[in-house]
């Protein structure tokens, strides 16, 4: 039943007032479109014929141009097709797919299924039926499997379907062992293969899977591909291969010894392996860097806000296990990991004094040591590892000559620590001093989100530090002013969650540090202020925090592929998390 609306209005003119009725029939557009479709099927008033294969489709130029920018440009910019009464796609377009697109143009409806989804995505992109392309991509997202995710990744990359690409990419990383057995794997470009195997988020319990995958790819088309082997080998964590596997590869794999560059790479891997087996200090070579799925998750916390213990998260048993005591209990410090070591910087001790101290926990030998103190005593600061160095950012220090100790305004000063030299140095200061900000490293840069300003206001800026230029820039504005948030990194995506207001406490966002664009993701399961987050494999983990008088007692996990949060385990009631870090696991023999 059609619905119409009559509105009576008064309009004043030179002759006085008069009544005007505005009539609106909501179903009119559908009726017109339906009748145009009837006219098309009877070839009435059609003025162009589209050909695909051996089939002809009479159409109306106006309907095509209104439905697709492709046809609008074709018919209005003086192209040959704007004058001809036929457009021939020949064999570039399947007739059944073109028929579906035309039915959509004349009805606004289309049936997408497993058999036509890929073809509709390709044709929708080619003919700029972007709504159809996006609908097909959404259908394919819901039908992603390890067996088809590589093909979907390549398809979505070719047709600018970013969301489908991200989901497919994540699934390729999670199921790499299955992906390498697919037909598409051996046809990958070198650059795409390199992107996959160089990712810290690639999930495999055995680096031999990656090593064997690149040899498989090179041997599939040996002559043109063997030149790429050195570059590919540099992205394999060769020092994480078992010793016997590494030795056997060097002695029996002729392909590895055929090029001087590959020989040097394998020699370096053997040297790193020897150092690892001899416990000869921290091995920071890229060939010895574990992927994130091979990291150990550690929580620093205590029974009060004064942290006095390290706990280890056992993924499989879903338990949180006490690991070691802190030599000097403290609060409002920051903690970051470099390799197998945890660096605890600054904070306030039991006497409320602000500390310059840096305590280092070696997870291999399970012992504490002191590193060189920071140049400025600080608390409420952030820290992050970048290129095997530690950066501490912002925070507060104590005001000189004030007793008892009183906090300063938010600091601009940023310090860099070199573990090899055991030395601190100042680098370029923040554009805006902040405390209680979220600090992470991604894509060889530091990012600082929000925080408390020198005027004690919440900050909404994203500050970015480029170490190659020793310079800070403002990259973007946050969706809202933030402080007491947590941040974690997956590839080029930085995830921000929590905060100290009713509107931010449960919210979570994704920031693309290559495009500087924000995306809202699913809310957390609870409101969290001062929570802590990190990435492991292709998932995010968040722990701790509170809101009002309610403490958050769960360790939750976020899966980006499904945009869902789930509880992993309950944090012991006596534990109040103060920091959350991931370190390298003990490296295999």
From Swiss-Prot:
Q: Does the keyword Repeat apply?
A: yes
Q: Where are the Kelch repeats?
A: 296-340, 341-388, 389-444, 446-492, 494-538, 539-585
Gene symbol of the encoding locus? KLHL25
UniProt-listed Pfam families: BACK, Beta-prop_ATRN-LZTR1, BTB
UniProt xrefs under PANTHER family: KELCH PROTEIN, KELCH-LIKE PROTEIN 25
* Lineage, opening ranks: Eukaryota, Metazoa, Chordata, Craniata, Vertebrata
Q: Which residues form the BTB domain?
A: 46-114
What Gene Ontology cellular-component terms does the record carry?
Cul3-RING ubiquitin ligase complex; cytoplasm; cytosol
List the SUPFAM superfamilies hit by this protein, alphabetically: Kelch motif (SSF117281), POZ domain (SSF54695)
Protein's recorded name: Kelch-like protein 25
Native source species? Homo sapiens (Human)
Its GO biological process terms?
negative regulation of fatty acid biosynthetic process; positive regulation of CD4-positive, CD25-positive, alpha-beta regulatory T cell differentiation; positive regulation of fatty acid oxidation; protein ubiquitination; regulation of translational initiation; ubiquitin-dependent protein catabolic process
Pathway, according to UniProt? Protein modification; protein ubiquitination
Query: Matching InterPro entries, A to Z?
Result: BACK (IPR011705), Beta-prop_ATRN-MKLN-like (IPR056737), BTB-kelch_protein (IPR017096), BTB/POZ_dom (IPR000210), Kelch-typ_b-propeller (IPR015915), Kelch_1 (IPR006652), KLHL25_BTB_POZ_dom (IPR030565), SKP1/BTB/POZ_sf (IPR011333)
In terms of Gene3D superfamilies, this protein maps to: 1.25.40.420, Kelch-type beta propeller, Potassium Channel Kv1.1, Chain A
Q: What is this protein for, i.e. what is its function?
A: Substrate-specific adapter of a BCR (BTB-CUL3-RBX1) E3 ubiquitin ligase complex involved in various processes, such as translation homeostasis and lipid synthesis. The BCR(KLHL25) ubiquitin ligase complex acts by mediating ubiquitination of hypophosphorylated EIF4EBP1 (4E-BP1): ubiquitination and subsequent degradation of hypophosphorylated EIF4EBP1 (4E-BP1) probably serves as a homeostatic mechanism to maintain translation and prevent eIF4E inhibition when eIF4E levels are low. The BCR(KLHL25) complex does not target EIF4EBP1 (4E-BP1) when it is hyperphosphorylated or associated with eIF4E.
């Amino acid at each position: 039943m059609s619905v119409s609306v009559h509105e009576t209005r008064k309009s004043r003119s030179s002759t006085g007032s008069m009544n005007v009725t505005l009539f609106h029939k909501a179903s009119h557009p559908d009726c017109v479109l339906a009748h145009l479709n009837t006219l098309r099927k009877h070839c009435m008033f059609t003025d162009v014929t589209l050909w695909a294969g051996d089939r002809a489709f009479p159409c109306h130029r106006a309907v095509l141009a209104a439905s697709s920018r492709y046809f609008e440009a074709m018919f209005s910019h003086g192209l040959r097709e704007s004058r001809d009464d036929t457009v021939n796609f020949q064999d570039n377009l399947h007739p059944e797919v073109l028929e579906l697109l035309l039915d959509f143009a004349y009805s606004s409806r289309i049936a997408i299924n497993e058999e036509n989804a890929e073809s509709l995505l390709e044709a929708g992109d080619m003919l700029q039926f972007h709504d159809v392309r996006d609908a097909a991509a959404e259908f394919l997202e819901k039908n992603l499997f390890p067996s088809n995710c590589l093909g979907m990744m390549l398809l979505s990359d070719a047709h600018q379907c970013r969301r489908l690409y991200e989901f497919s990419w994540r699934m390729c990383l999670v199921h790499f062992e299955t992906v390498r057995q697919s037909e598409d794997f051996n046809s990958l470009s070198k650059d795409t293969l390199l992107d996959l195997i160089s990712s810290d988020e690639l999930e495999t319990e055995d680096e031999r899977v990656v090593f064997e995958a690149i040899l498989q790819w090179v041997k599939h088309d040996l002559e043109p591909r063997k030149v790429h082997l050195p570059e590919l080998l540099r992205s394999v964590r060769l020092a994480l291969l078992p010793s016997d596997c590494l030795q056997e590869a060097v002695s029996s794999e002729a392909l590895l010894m055929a090029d001087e560059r590959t020989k040097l790479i394998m020699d370096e891997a053997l040297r790193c392996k020897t150092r690892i087996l001899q416990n000869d200090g921290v091995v920071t070579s890229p060939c010895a860097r574990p992927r994130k799925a091979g990291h150990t998750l550690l929580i620093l916390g205590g029974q009060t806000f004064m942290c006095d213990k390290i706990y280890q998260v056992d993924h499989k048993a879903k338990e949180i296990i006490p690991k070691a005591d802190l030599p000097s209990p403290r609060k409002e410090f920051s903690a970051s990991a470099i390799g197998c070591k945890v660096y605890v910087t600054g904070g306030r001790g039991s006497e409320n004094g602000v500390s310059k101290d840096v305590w280092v926990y070696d997870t291999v030998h399970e012992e504490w040591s002191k590193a060189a103190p920071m140049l400025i005593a600080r608390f409420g600061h952030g820290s992050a590892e970048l290129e095997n160095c530690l950066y501490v950012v912002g925070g507060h220090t104590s005001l000189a000559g004030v007793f008892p100790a009183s906090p300063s305004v938010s600091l601009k000063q940023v310090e860099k620590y070199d573990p090899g030299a055991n030395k601190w140095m100042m680098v370029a200061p923040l554009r805006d001093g902040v405390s209680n900000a979220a600090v992470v490293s991604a894509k060889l840069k530091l990012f600082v989100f929000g925080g408390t300003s020198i005027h004690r206001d919440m900050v909404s800026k994203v500050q970015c530090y480029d170490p190659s230029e020793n310079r800070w820039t403002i990259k973007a504005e946050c969706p809202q002013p933030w402080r007491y948030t947590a941040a974690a990194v997956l590839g080029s995506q930085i995830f921000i969650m929590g905060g100290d207001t009713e509107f931010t406490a449960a919210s979570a966002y994704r920031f693309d540090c290559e495009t500087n664009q924000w995306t809202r993701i699913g809310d957390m399961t609870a409101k969290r202020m001062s929570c802590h987050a990190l990435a492991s494999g292709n998932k995010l983990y968040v722990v701790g925090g509170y809101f009002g008088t309610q403490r958050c007692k769960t360790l939750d996990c976020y899966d980006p592929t499904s945009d869902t949060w789930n509880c992993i385990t309950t944090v012991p009631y006596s534990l109040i998390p103060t920091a959350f870090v991931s370190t390298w696991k003990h490296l295999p023999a």
